[in-house]
Amino acid sequence: PLDGERVGEMVYIDLLNRARHSVHIITPYLILDGELETALRFAAERGVDVHLILPGKPDKVFAYALAKTHYLPLLSSGVKISEWTPGFTHAKVMIMDGQEAVVGTINLDYRSLYHHFENAVWMRGVDCLPRIEADFQDTLAQCRTVEPTRQSVWQGKKLLHLVGMVLKFIAPLI
């Protein structure tokens, strides 16, 4: 963060822009800026299978509420969202076309991308990529699919919805 470079976000956006078939992501937090949200949506709109796995049970209610404010715009563009039902997942993984992956400490949230000292490993053409994809699929098997409806996203939690909408105005601070 001290050099002003947004390396983590730029790598994620680059993978999304170069993807031809799939981008599979597991992240505990989803607090997106416009550029990253646009890259996710654009990839899905051009036919890439973009699939996010997020926690079904939050560790931070405010971050959870804020993440859900991104669901409907993403879903409306064809991004698939699933929530891991056994509990909270803290994995940070992105795998693109089964050929490249990023695994590390970088969350898909503003603080992680802009303010924290995070790191990750970018991999291409290495033997562990099939295992990373298999782990995504195994995790997906334990998920609830989020449908592109308010009811599916918010599950009748009106207070959580209200909190999320209010927090969206101060998202960069969270």
Task: Give the residues covered by each predicted segment.
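Charged, low-complexity intrinsically disordered terminal segments
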Residues: 1-174
